[in-house]
Amino acid sequence: MLTPDSSVIKDSLCAVSRQLGFSGCRVARAEKSPHAEKLFQWLERGWHAGMEWMARSPERRTDPAEVLPGCRSVICLSYDYDSPGRRPEGEGSICLYAHGKDYHGILEEKLADLQELLSIYGGKQRGYVDSGPVMERDHAEACGLGWRGKSGCLLYTSDAADEARSVD
């Protein structure tokens, strides 16, 4: 059986991701988070407050191979929120992600389509939308989707335009 090389798979993945509406698609090696020690210290100090789930299996959060054994690559995608228009004068402002439908379900459906494509190539994968035990900002930065700002949010430049965006 002839299998395509990784660049063919990556090109196919990114082309399909654009068709699904993702604005960015990047791939990097699956490596342990450079901020692992900071996370462990943060947890030891009890700074996770009532988020007890953060303290369960912190190693899984910092190493993709702990989440998916044999993992070799991390795929990071960006998706621009729809902006239905400017808010009326005198009204309070609401974050863009809160204007429309809950993005978790929308993006999970799109990820399912991408996972189907990767399965054709024999890949095993896990997809998360702000819900998995992964340090997504570290992976997105390693993939080249953007850089970490002072706020800790990832600032990225859209593939479609040279405008900086903030995501968290």
Describe the residue ranges of each PLM region:
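Auxiliary alpha/beta "docking" domains used to position bulky ligands
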Residues: 1-159, 166
